[in-house]
């Protein structure tokens, strides 16, 4: 019975991951289109494996030079977008994320890294909303400088 339940649970995992990855890639394309200086942290899915790793289907980590990630996360939250600056296990540390360091993100950009995790049922409409919220946040921050 357990084996049947496990097989049922695993059914469609690859399809869901591919759908989520497609929305993630669309989200990145939308971000890059309206925020040209945005930087994708980590491997791009459309390139061969980078050092044996590929991006997780629901992960998007971006930097916008000059936009402090902590401020961006607060602003995005107010706009209904959940984001973070690091994984939950490293919250509270003053050091840049060990993952961001391992990806080779320069120290001066480490404080701009914004982590977005998409749900399996994420849509292109939601991806456009994320991109728009990031742009609004970046524009608002720049106008205060």
What are these regions (language model features)?
Residues 3-11:
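Short glycine/serine- and small hydrophobic-enriched flexible loop segments
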Residues 26, 30-34, 75-81, 131-140:
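Generic non-transmembrane alpha-helical segments
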Residues 60-114:
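Conserved C-terminal alpha-helix-loop-beta "cap" of PLP-dependent enzymes
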Residues 6, 27, 47, 64-66, ...:
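Glycine-rich beta-alpha junction loops
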Residues 12, 16-19, 91, 122, ...:
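Catalytic cores of large soluble enzymes that bind and process phosphate-bearing ligands
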Residues 11-63, 67-72:
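Conserved PLP-dependent catalytic core of the aminotransferase class-I/II
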Residues 95-145:
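PLP-dependent enzyme catalytic core of the Aspartate aminotransferase-like
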